[in-house]
Amino acid sequence: MKGVNFVFLMIALSVMIQCDSKEETLKTEPIVKERKKVIYQVFTRLFGNDNTLNKPWGTSEENGVGKFNDFDEKALKEIHDLGVSHIWYTGVLHHAMVTDYTAYGISNDDPDVVKGRAGSPYAVKDYYSVDPDLAVDPEKRMEEFEALIDRTHKQGMKVIIDIVPNHVARQYEGKNNPEGVSDFGAHDDTSVEYKRDNNFYYVIGEKFRVPNWKDGYSPLGGESHPLADGAFDENPAKWTGNGSRASQPDMNDWYETVKINYGVRPDGGKDFEELPADYASRDHQAHNDFWKGKEVPDSWIKFSDIAHFWLRQGVDGLRYDMAEMVPVEFWSYLNSSIKSKFPEALLLAEVYNPALYRDYIHKGKMDYLYDKVAFYDSIKHIVKGYGWTDHLPKVQEEVEDIEHHMLHFLENHDEQRIPSPDFAGSAEKGKPAMVVSTTISTSPTLVYFAQEVGEPGAEDAGFGSPTRTSIFDYIGVPSHQRWMNGKKFDGGSLSLEERDLREFYKTLLNFSLNSEALMGDYREIHYFNKDRTPGYDHRIFSFVRWTENEKLIIISNFDENRTYAVSYTHLRAH
């Protein structure tokens, strides 16, 4: 930018050198031996699909579906080389779907209580099995997933899968339960709304009724199906996954799921012992000891069995869906038992209420939580043009004591794609935000598959609307398919811009994995520069990261119409 004084870069170095003062520096724990983690979330059934038909509500035969086996040695090596330490395989567990697998002893699901044709991965139907869609041979689907775990480990990465303790599919049916394990609800007393050891809550005296559809919606887009009759047999009706107590949930409720009972009474009272306040500062072993010998609700035991089962199968970490809807005492019970047996397990939770962050970290023994409500929302507003970078220092200050636990991301399966018109409108505009998101804290970085090649999520898959890649239907992901290039996984069909974008991500993520400074101290220099540097404004953000051995100045320009120069001579001089 013409006429701008670039002295702020030299000031940044000077400030960094003088940052011994406790009043001026936001200190983080010195974790220099550890390095940043990078989690690559992949929607498993979409990853290897190279079919380009993309028919709304299309079947797996029409639109295609990816398989576990598509993650071959070459594909996994390319993901690892992108700068990835962990893969979160989303949609692995057997969930409700419309596709017919009765030939394999699996009951059909009712389209009236399934979102999309392929189904939501968060409406789990059988916790001890995997999605038959993902197997070349559905009869051997567990063996194929176990082989994928092994291939992933051989490429130097760890495996994360989802556990969804808050709810299950409306038509839960455990066909693969280990010996001694009973289905959810199998022993419930359905004559009462609530009982501690019931797995579900009930709407006494009322049958379940399918929601009244809105805005022209109908299951499967109106296609005829023998089970799509506007009814689903459930008597008495159960509470819905998001907590709705209506026998006829709204279309915007999580009507395809049923809420799990964790011993929380309908009036909010608890039928389990609460943790003493001082347990917020006690380690997982103390928590594990606390729960030994105590009676806990049946649902606690069921989900503990599930989590331990998958960790024994070789999974390295668990991502807990909607964790804040489950009492923190359960997380203390579960996670302390996990850490006692699998101390290296990575435990990531979806929590959106900032008032709960510290309890779920300290009492619930979570390793990481989503940093959405503050960091993601703020930086998205900046990218969209109406947020100011002035807000970011405050956001970081608010989580200073827990910043290492706050996972950063710009995309995931719930959020809009960066190039979509409702976010940035282009992948290029996301670059400054990605730099800040990846480098501002010691927390892990999450990247959603095809983010690195600028996927806009523009397809109409059926259920839901574009801007997000569908998690409900069979669909192709065009930019990702160009990277797959006929399953060569070499990026051979990418455009020049897509290749450049992927190289940007590869450089940034690998740097973050290897940088000592990114696990060291942080200080914002934004306000210092804004007060003293002509031309520096609310569209620029700057901060420093350092350890004794490595010092970084990080500056991001969010204004696509203005450019700034850096004098490396001055930088070297300092």
Task: Give the predicted meaning of each segment.
Residues A169-S281, E400-H404, M434-L446:
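Active-site region of glycoside hydrolase catalytic domains
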Residues E24-K158, N166-V168, Y172-N176, D188-D189, ...:
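N-terminal structural segment of carbohydrate-active enzymes
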Residues V38-Y40, I87, V159-I161, L318, ...:
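Hydrophobic faces of well-ordered beta-strands that scaffold small-molecule active sites
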Residues A169-R170, K175-P178, W331, Y352-H381, ...:
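Substrate-binding cleft/loops of secretory-pathway carbohydrate-active enzymes
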Residues I17-Q18:
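C-terminal motif of bacterial Sec signal peptides marking the signal peptidase cleavage site
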